[in-house]
Amino acid sequence: MNSNRSLLIMGLLLVSFLIFTQWQQDYNPEIQAQKQAMAQAQTQQVANQSSDVPASSNAASINEQSTKGKTITIETDVLRLTVDTLGGDVVDSDLLKYNAELDSNTPFELLQDNGKVLYVAQSGLVGKNGIDTTAGRAQYQATAEKFALAEGQDEIALPLTFEKDGVVYTKTFTLKRGSYNVAVNYHIKNGTAETLEVQPYGQLKHTLVESTGNFAMPTYTGGAYSSSEVNYKKYSFDEMAKANLSVDTKAGWAAVLQHYFVSAWIPNQDAENNLYTRTGNGVGTIGYRGPVTQVAPNGEATITSHLWTGPKDQAAMAQVANNFDLTVDYGWAWFIAKPLFWLLTFIQSIVSNWGLAIIGVTIVVKTILYPLTKAQYTSMAKMRMLQPRIQEMRERFGDDRQRMSQEMMKLYKEEKVNPMGGCLPILLQMPIFIALYWTFMEAVELRHAPFFGWIQDLSAQDPYYIFPLLMGGSMYLLQKMSPTPIADPVQQKVMNFMPVMFTVFFLWFPSGLVLYWLTSNLITIAQQWLIYRNLEKKGLHTRVKK
């Protein structure tokens, strides 16, 4: 197999991958159903949905509406939350280390309730003695309107209190320096002579939206959960509209995902919880209900949970709950993507530039594949040396294809030539390319990460298309270095068009991925020149003699 045909196969594999990805985005039956469900749901009213509470294990479903209370803010070095005193819901979260836009000083707003988009984190107590009922939700009191982490402090707490019929409920949000993991705990002090029964819940509500992106950078916006039976599963808004999720599990979590960021409720991991979803009035809800907690007369009880609202930081999320880091979804290529991401971050820790880290990863990958690359070109050179004998066989055996095939296999065995030896490096490179594709798509570390000059965001496409054009030029040069021209005119036309086609495709790819492909092409050019030079010295002709 000559190198032009190798490029052709690689091109066809890449095109197939892109076509499949776009088909999934546009024509997958589930996606089409999701669009229809959202269109129907969004014709309904969205207003006043932020106060819905779920049904408890012994109560009917509640769809209560009421006005908002006061808002309280609590801020650390990385996170600012806005909490509504009515119900103690988190109605806004600002990620202070992430800008909304590349050249903006405005922090990225994850949770929000701005009249256009509803995305809030609710929690409360339902059940026999719950304070979130059809009659209304708890109106908490706070000691101040603003809480901020002071210099030298490692954590800060926002306590909200509510007293009713001799029972004091304290809902406390605790934030730690440098962390997006928020402890949300209830302390119940029962001053009555009766045993109380309450059931905690936490849920995320999000306006029904479609997943966004283009064929090169598709993104997912929707639900996901983890249980004792399923490590990680996406549960889209479409699936929520079709059927309400109800999963009983020990531990687990429920989340809403979007590109680079995630919010999730993580209940008590030692308790039996119910994960659920529902949709209505243009809003999708995913959350959990914990077990019933009994509070003895004149006794006290504490109920714990955590809320994550922040970036998809794999290392940090792995410390929060089992399988939470799987929200960084590498698809089927995860077993390649994870070590590649580790290598990428390791190199970046040394060179302090994500673009240089990508170049470093490319060099490592090409070095590992070099023995296979060398074997590929050596096999191709030997195949060219056998062309006169193969041509002689064609003339001798004519239309006797079976005899021709037998003699060719015999010849390959005698000369120790593998006719498919040129395919293996290509087949190995494509999974690596796909793994890198999803690594660059999912890694929040690359968001707004500069390289140099005009490349100020490696997660976005090249604004001036310089990298795609250079990549196309390098591919054209690599093609022209091929020692054997393609005889078939149709294949030759396809090959001539391949650099142009690749260039057009890569116009929309993240510049980090284009940088990888460009660097890979340049290294391949150098490797090919070196290998052919050494083969010529050994008497193996790398070009067909005219």
Curated annotation (Swiss-Prot):
Membrane topology term: Multi-pass membrane protein
Recorded GO CC terms: plasma membrane
Keywords: Cell inner membrane, Cell membrane, Chaperone, Membrane, Protein transport, Transmembrane, Transmembrane helix, Transport
Entry annotated with the keyword Transcription regulation: no
Region annotated Disordered, chain positions: 43-64
GO biological process per UniProt: protein insertion into membrane; protein transport
UniProt-listed Pfam families: 60KD_IMP, YidC_periplas
Family, per entry: Belongs to the OXA1/ALB3/YidC family. Type 1 subfamily.
Matching PANTHER family: CYTOCHROME C OXIDASE ASSEMBLY PROTEIN COX18, MITOCHONDRIAL, OXA1
Function description: Required for the insertion and/or proper folding and/or complex formation of integral membrane proteins into the membrane. Involved in integration of membrane proteins that insert both dependently and independently of the Sec translocase complex, as well as at least some lipoproteins. Aids folding of multispanning membrane proteins.
UniProt-listed NCBIfam families: PRK01318.1-1, PRK01318.1-3, PRK01318.1-4, yidC_nterm, yidC_oxa1_cterm
UniProt protein name: Membrane protein insertase YidC
Organism of origin: Glaesserella parasuis serovar 5 (strain SH0165)
Taxonomic lineage of the native organism: Bacteria, Pseudomonadati, Pseudomonadota, Gammaproteobacteria, Pasteurellales
